Design a protein with these regions (language model features):
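Short hydrophobic alpha-helical runs that function as membrane-insertion/retention elements
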Residues: 40, 63-65, 105-106, 188-190, ...
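Long, charge-dense
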Residues: 132-133, 221-259
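N-terminal beta-loop-helix "entrance" segment that forms/cooperates
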Residues: 30-33, 37-61
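Bateman/CBS regulatory modules and CBS-like beta-alpha motifs in cytosolic regions of diverse proteins
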Residues: 66-96, 108, 114, 141-156, ...
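A glycine-centered beta-loop-beta connector
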Residues: 76, 97, 105-123, 276, ...
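A short, polar/charged loop-to-alpha-helix boundary motif
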Residues: 120-137, 301-310
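Conserved small/polar residues in nucleotide/adenosyl-binding loops
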Residues: 324
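Short N-terminal binding/cap micro-motifs at the start of the first secondary-structure element
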Residues: 16-22, 50, 319-320
């Protein structure tokens, strides 16, 4: 998108008088009419009463204040990508990173407040922690996340329910073995074996995930409803379900919440460059004047910044330009 830095700023000296401001306005207008440049008049200080009178007399809009022409983050072609909610699954976050070719995502609230960031490293770490069978309960994973990740459908229960207890169990063993492993509140991954499904329900599991797209019998559905056990049907096999189930956890459980390296739209690019040289992150969130999230900036964006072009008018002394250049 076009940025202010791509315009040519025409500006007079500090503590401007009438000739300084009028020179900037006139020369900016001349360059706009006689060249391909896009020029904008600015002033390097407050206008005096004489200047205000002259501009009002001729119906000329006063130029905007500009006491510093050094580039800010708002002048950089940063990525205006939307934030994602903390309820987003690890799998979905990874897919967004893959599609957008970015390794850091901002996590925002409904009113666009920055809540944290999730990186591809965070997702990789979570995926390697496969032995934590209680992760869905710890992270308060929604059934909706599980359905989305496994491509499943809800057979018994509500999509908005949340995993609050239990461990993940793979129920491919015999019903006799299931009786000794499944506990109340567990999440059990099963096939179409009727006896195993019934055993898991009788052991008061909280959720059954029936794999291979198998249909769930009416009797099992009725008993599950009576026992308060939710049932899902998923097209994947038990191996894939076991691999994907931990990726259903929400990113809010893994994201970085504190000490987030972020910038504002008015942060000088020089300061940003110094910070980026000291840390290994590639993308950094940007906040607007209201403290709301508005985009991400990377080293590449900063390097690609076009230098700001300036035309100085009515500058007779070297000290005249110190306040703006």
């Amino acid at each position: 998108m076009p940025k202010t830095a791509h315009k040519v700023v025409v500006i007079g000296h500090r503590n401007p008088d009438t000739d300084s401001i009028c020179s900037a306005i006139a020369y900016a207008e001349l360059k706009n009419k006689t060249s391909d440049l896009v020029c904008e008049a600015r002033r390097a200080g407050k206008m005096n009463q004489e200047t205000e009178f002259v501009l009002k007399k001729f119906g000329v809009k006063p130029p905007r204040m500009c006491t510093d022409v050094n580039p800010k983050i708002r002048d950089v072609d940063y990525r205006e990508m939307p934030g994602i909610p903390g309820t987003t699954s690890l799998r979905k976050a990874w897919e967004i990173m893959r599609d957008k070719q970015i390794d850091t995502l901002p996590v925002t609230s409904p009113d666009n407040e920055l809540e944290g960031v999730i990186t591809v490293k965070d997702i990789a770490t979570a995926n390697m922690d496969v032995f934590d069978t209680g992760i869905l309960a710890k992270s308060q994973t929604t059934y909706r996340n599980i359905l989305e990740t496994l491509g499943g459908t809800m057979v018994v229960g509500r999509e908005d329910d949340v995993c609050t207890t239990g461990h993940i169990r793979i129920g491919t063993a015999t019903p006799e073995m299931l009786e000794n492993t499944v506990e109340k509140g567990d999440i059990v991954i099963l096939t179409n074996r009727y006896e195993s499904q019934l055993c898991a329900i009788e052991k008061e599991a909280s959720l059954l995930i029936i794999c291979n797209g198998s249909k769930v019998g009416h009797t099992i559905q009725r008993i599950a409803e009576e026992m308060g056990v939710a049932i899902m049907s998923a097209p994947v096999d038990t191996y894939a379900a076991g691999k994907l189930i931990s990726q259903c956890a929400p990113i809010s459980y893994y994201m970085t919440r504190s000490d987030i390296m972020k910038f504002t739209l008015v942060t000088p690019v020089a300061d940003v460059t110094r910070v980026m040289a000291k840390v290994r992150h590639r993308y950094f969130p940007i906040l607007d004047e209201d403290g709301k999230y508005c985009g991400m900036v990377s080293r590449r964006n900063v390097i690609a910044l076009r230098k700001r072009r300036i035309i100085l008018v009515d500058h007779n002394e070297a000290t005249d330009r110190k306040s703006v250049v």
